UniProtKB/Swiss-Prot annotation:
GO terms for cellular component: cytoplasmic vesicle; extracellular region. This is Hyaluronidase CdtHya1. Belongs to the glycosyl hydrolase 56 family. It comes from Crotalus durissus terrificus. Optimum temperature is 37 degrees Celsius. Snake venom endo-hyaluronidase that degrades hyaluronan to smaller oligosaccharide fragments. In venom, it is not toxic by itself, but increases the diffusion of other venom proteins such as crotoxin (a neurotoxic and myotoxic PLA2) by degrading the extracellular matrix. In addition, it displays antiedematogenic activity, since it significantly diminishes the oedematogenic activity of crotoxin (probably by direct substrate hydrolysis, since hyaluronan possesses strong water-binding capacity). It is found in: Secreted. The keyword Transmembrane does not apply.
Length: 44
């Protein structure tokens, strides 16, 4: 069995976090700076 190459070079694994963190800023004025974790959000 042969392993496939990573989807993104130099990233050993990917984490998907399905949490509406944008709502924290809009509703509660709490800004969660997730840049340290390289978390990308969408516009929804």
């Amino acid at each position: 069995m042969q392993a496939k190459a990573p989807m993104y070079p130099n990233e050993p694994f990917l984490v998907f976090w399905n949490a509406p963190t944008t709502q924290c800023r809009l509703r509660y004025k709490v800004d969660l700076d997730l840049n340290t974790f390289h978390i990308v959000t969408n516009a929804r």
